[in-house]
Regions:
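AMP-binding/adenylate-forming
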Residues: 131, 143-168
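Acidic/polar active-site rim loop that often engages polyanionic ligands
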Residues: 106-111, 160-164
């Protein structure tokens, strides 16, 4: 099972996302701002259109889709609390439930929080980790210790031999 999980997160799979992340480093501040604004608007519009939770939250706050035109408009959006995420995680989804994987936060600041991830977000996160480590001089295959709070409760630690990584 560990080899399958590793393979699904390996370089050949995440290569397109690595290119996307690397491109961020060559952008000017203005290009980066425009990119971030475009992504914010895409995410907001998807949440408004596809998520029952967000649509209701924004409607009750008097926010229409056309009210959010730029990144500065993020100030208009209601704050979302951990309690809201705990109570409405399924309603927050913008894709069918079968398309996501359940994950949990570590609960470092209190109770663990159930969240959902789709494969593209997992691959994008892997790409960020890959690029960051590579920029700091890390070569894959070198021993690595990863301190993360998302191990199964039965595991105190996990050694992934394919990546030479020890997870705590």
């Amino acid at each position: 099972m560990e080899s399958c999980k590793y393979m699904l997160r390996s370089y050949p799979i995440i290569r397109p996302y690595i290119k996307e992340v690397n491109a961020l480093f060559s952008m000017s501040p203005e290009e980066l701002r425009k990119r971030n604004e475009r992504r914010f608007l895409e995410i907001f519009q998807r949440a408004y259109d596809k998520s029952p939770f967000y649509h209701k939250l924004y409607t009750e706050a008097g926010i229409k889709k056309e009210d959010i035109k730029c990144l500065d408009d993020i100030k208009k959006l209601p704050v979302i609390t951990k309690d809201m995420v705990r109570s409405h995680a399924d309603e927050m989804l913008t894709v069918p439930r079968w398309k996501v994987i359940v994950a949990n936060t570590s609960g470092t600041t209190g109770t663990p929080l159930r969240v959902y991830e789709d494969w593209s977000s997992i691959w994008r996160n892997q790409a960020y980790a890959y690029v960051t480590r590579k920029r700091e001089g890390f070569t894959y295959g070198q021993p690595l210790v990863s301190l993360r709070g998302n191990l199964d409760k039965r595991d105190m630690m996990l050694k992934v031999h394919a990546s030479n990584t020890l997870f705590f």
